[in-house]
Swiss-Prot record:
A lipid is attached at G257 (Cholesterol glycine ester). The lineage of its organism: Eukaryota, Metazoa, Ecdysozoa, Arthropoda, Hexapoda. It is found in: Nucleus; Cytoplasm. One of its GO terms (cellular component) is plasma membrane. It is an enzyme of class 3 (hydrolase). This is Protein hedgehog. The record marks T326 as: Involved in auto-cleavage. The gene is hh. It comes from Drosophila grimshawi (Hawaiian fruit fly).
Length: 479
């Protein structure tokens, strides 16, 4: 809870107390008046003073109210949240500075046809193509279409493209009241865009603002990134180019967020251990709510599959650290202007952003390092350990244990039952005996038995991923 909210609640409490006090004094005044009237008719006896009775009758009600108010304040103050971030959490959403793109900049800084961006071409769609029925028209009063052909082709696009365009139109009207989004090109059936183009599949749009103010285009590109377009390019001073993944692309679902098995975590002993060999109960280097390095216990694996091929984002820092992680995974990003930490999807991290990296020169503290390069690679195997802190330091880079949902605090709250279950299990003496007996009976390390126990998504994580589409707004999900 922030200071303004606490101050407001205490102000309300003070005002309530004042009103109750005034009410009591008014009641006392009425009692005095009645007492004087009665004293003129009958003499005052030595029985209990009516003012004391009134005060006694009033006090429990005021005490009860104050008790309830204090309980409310305690409940609000004890909700889980990171003191330095993230940008989106359970409480009031923090305003985030949005920086316009510069001319020729693309987000992400990958080839448009890579899996980490809009993905490969799937083939030209014309009116006779079977896939033409998958294109949908967009009619929205907040969006203007140039439609030079006069055929309505510019209104045709994939469902995903339509979805992102509607979100962008709302952002444009909020950013510049009275200005609308202008679509100059969408699906192209006349092949005006060269040999290869996502315009031919209805997966790309060329946009501008209705007032044609070129000074707005850098911010327009940034708003397109925030709206969820998979690849945005400030390609020209006259317009912005945006594209999306195919509706049939398996990469859209992002059912998990993981690291590679060969990536390493640091144990409490100081040794480095590959994530593919981690076991439940290992204590690994993590990050607490204040951004400090701490050791935290691994309580489960949300996903673990050593054979699955996956596309990863690689972040290279100026200190030599390299983090390989799936696009939907949350990464801690340091905001030097606001001196705060945000949790950002890996494929939204850009060059010149800052991530937290373990600095051996300062005794293992987490220090910001600049991202020099962002790339996309294919690797075999995925591992997603969950620590009690909800964070983990992998290859010396601090990251979240969560993915898909943009709110670190909400994701951490959602896994609270698993943390509680892990705590209850640790209290069972039989479990410790069982573990010790297994260690004595088997000469193989504990990690091998763990590897055999789980292959794939954890049932609880899988349930949360399925529910998210029904309970969370789309802007909070990695789509």
């Amino acid at each position: 809870m922030d200071n303004e909210a606490v101050s407001a609640l205490w102000s309300c409490a003070s005002a309530t107390c004042l009103s109750l006090d005034v009410k009591r004094h008014c009641s006392d005044a009425n009692v005095d008046s009645q007492a004087r009237t009665q004293s003129q008719a009958t003499p005052m006896t030595n029985e209990t003073d009516p003012r004391k009775l009134r005060h006694i009758a009033h006090t429990p009600r005021g005490s009860c109210f104050m008790t309830l108010l204090l309980l409310l304040l305690l409940a609000l103050n004890f909700r889980h949240a990171h003191s330095c971030g993230p940008g989106r959490g359970l409480g009031r959403r923090r305003d985030r500075n949005l920086y316009p793109l510069v001319l020729k900049q693309t987000v992400p800084n990958l080839s448009e046809y890579q899996s980490g961006a809009s993905g490969p071409l799937e083939g030209v769609i014309d009116r006779k193509s079977p896939k033409f029925k998958d294109l949908v028209p967009l009619y929205n009063s907040d969006i203007l279409f140039r439609d030079e052909e006069g055929t309505g082709a510019d209104r045709m696009m994939t469902k995903r493209c339509k979805e992102k365009l509607v979100m962008l139109a709302t952002s444009v009207m909020n950013e510049w009241p009275g200005v609308k989004l202008l679509v100059t090109e969408s699906w192209d059936e006349d092949h005006h865009h060269g040999e290869q183009s996502l315009h031919y599949e209805g997966r790309a749009v060329t946009i501008a603002t209705s007032d044609r103010d070129q000074s707005k285009y850098g911010m327009l590109a940034r708003l397109a990134v925030e709206a969820g377009f998979d690849w945005v390019s400030y390609v020209s001073r006259r317009h912005i180019y945006c594209s999306v993944k195919s509706d049939s692309s398996s990469s859209i679902s992002h059912v998990h967020g993981c690291f590679t098995p060969e990536s390493t975590a640091q144990l409490e002993s100081g040794a480095k251990k590959p994530l593919g060999e981690l076991a439940i109960g290992d204590r690994v280097l993590s990050m607490d709510a204040k951004g400090q390095a701490v050791y935290s216990e691994v309580i489960l694996f949300m996903d673990r599959n050593l054979e699955q091929m996956e596309t990863f984002v690689q972040l290279h820092t100026d200190g030599g650290a390299v983090l390989t992680v799936t696009p939907a995974h949350l990464i801690t990003v340091w905001q030097p202007e606001r001196q705060t930490l945000d949790f950002v999807f890996a494929d939204h991290v850009e060059e010149l952003n800052y991530v937290l990296v373990v600095d051996d020169a300062t005794g293992g503290e987490l220090r910001p390092q600049r991202v020099l390069r962002v790339s996309s690679v294919r690797r075999r195997g995925v591992v997603a350990p969950l620590t009690r802190e909800g964070t983990i330091v992998v290859n010396s880079v601090a990251a979240s244990c969560y993915a898909v949902i943009s709110s670190q605090s909400l994701a951490h709250w959602g896994l609270a039952p698993m943390r509680l279950w892990s705590t209850l299990q640790s209290w069972l003496p039989a479990k410790d005996k069982l573990r010790s007996s297994k260690v004595q009976e088997k000469s193989t390390p504990k990690v091998n038995s763990t590897a055999q126990l789980q292959n794939g998504l954890h049932w609880y994580a899988n349930a949360l991923y399925k529910v998210k589409d029904y309970v969370l707004p789309q802007s909070w999900r990695h789509d």
